[in-house]
Amino acid sequence: MIEKLQAIEDRYVELSQKISDPNVISNVEEWRKYVKEHAAIEDIVLKYREYKKVLEEIKATEELLSSQDEELKEMAEEELSQLEEKKEKLMEEIKILLLPKDPNDEKNVIMEIRAGAGGEEAALFAYDLFRMYTMYAEKKGWKVEIMSANKTDIGGFKEVIFSISGKGAYSRLKYESGVHRVQRIPTTEAGGRIHTSTATVAVLPEAEEVDVEINPNDIKIDVFRSSGHGGQSVNTTDSAVRVTHIPTGIVVTCQDERSQIQNRERALKILRAKLYEMALKEQQREIAEARKSQVGTGERSERIRTYNFPQGRVTDHRIGLTLYKLQEVLDGELDEIIDALILNDQAEKLKNMTLN
């Protein structure tokens, strides 16, 4: 471990020299590459330097233990205990920094929420989840844009697809994929019985054109007239677009925009994200077979969280976390849950790093 850290620090010093070298600066592409690498390892190097400083302090303090002065010796023992604790803490932090980074963490996301079992109540819950993520995004300073929505007459969503753009969006929202369950008394329920409904959330990293190349011969594009609630026409032109990816059978429909071009662009953006997710899942299949992650990003069929209204309770089943802050969570206060999921995920990866 120490040898690896020293090698990283040596590389950091080398990169520091390169990015201030006029010959390198004149080649913008090369300079950017070095700056990116330099930034990627900076946190590890700074933490390692802090660790080395503590080692020096431990060595100096240990020398005081041989002192004849009992008071000085006692002070040294107390300080040594604190330094050893600090050393262990720094090493744990370094290990976390050394964990492989998810290359998609800095990407924007495309989220899909679909009403599951529970009819109208499930559609209302899908809306509640959409509102929760929208409010969370606002708190983070991220931008939300609805790409496609299938609304119900009483204000729910049968399905809603939306993008969230902002720094680190995927790194925090990726843990939301899976089946979310709600337990509450519907407003339409006269008998006051608690109903259980579900909604499925999918979180896809937004794919750039360089990530996924779509062969024009592999897609079929149909245009038709947009329709609103009850099938009434909302547009007199064929502006709605249905894109079918022939090799996979994936179908994406967009009709929210008045322009056929805008709907086509949105449909292709969603398709690109879905194809990228398929490729990622294929890559991760072998890893998943070797190590079943307790948290991961959650299989879509996996029930991950329950929102219990009578008890004001939210329970994340993957880590056994229960919070009696239902309204706060639904108002976008998600950090406490997400931070706990990230810590658990890191602990699992550290355990595997040790085993390997």
Curated annotation (Swiss-Prot):
Keyword set includes Cytoplasm: yes
SUPFAM superfamilies: Release factor (SSF75620)
Role this protein plays: Peptide chain release factor 1 directs the termination of translation in response to the peptide chain termination codons UAG and UAA.
GO cellular component entries: cytoplasm
Protein biosynthesis found in the keyword field: yes
Record Gene3D superfamilies: 3.30.160.20, 3.30.70.1660, 6.10.140.1950
Main localization, broad class: cytoplasm
NCBIfam families in the cross-refs: prfA (TIGR00019), PRK00591.1 (NF001859)
InterPro entries according to UniProt: PCRF (IPR005139), Pep_chain_release_fac_I (IPR000352), Pep_chain_release_fac_I_sf (IPR045853), Prokaryotic/Mito_RF (IPR050057), RF-1 (IPR004373)
Modified residues (N5-methylglutamine): Q232
Location of the protein in the cell: Cytoplasm
Family statement: Belongs to the prokaryotic/mitochondrial release factor family.
Name the UniProt record assigns to this protein: Peptide chain release factor 1
Family matches, as SMART domains: PCRF
GO molecular function: translation release factor activity, codon specific
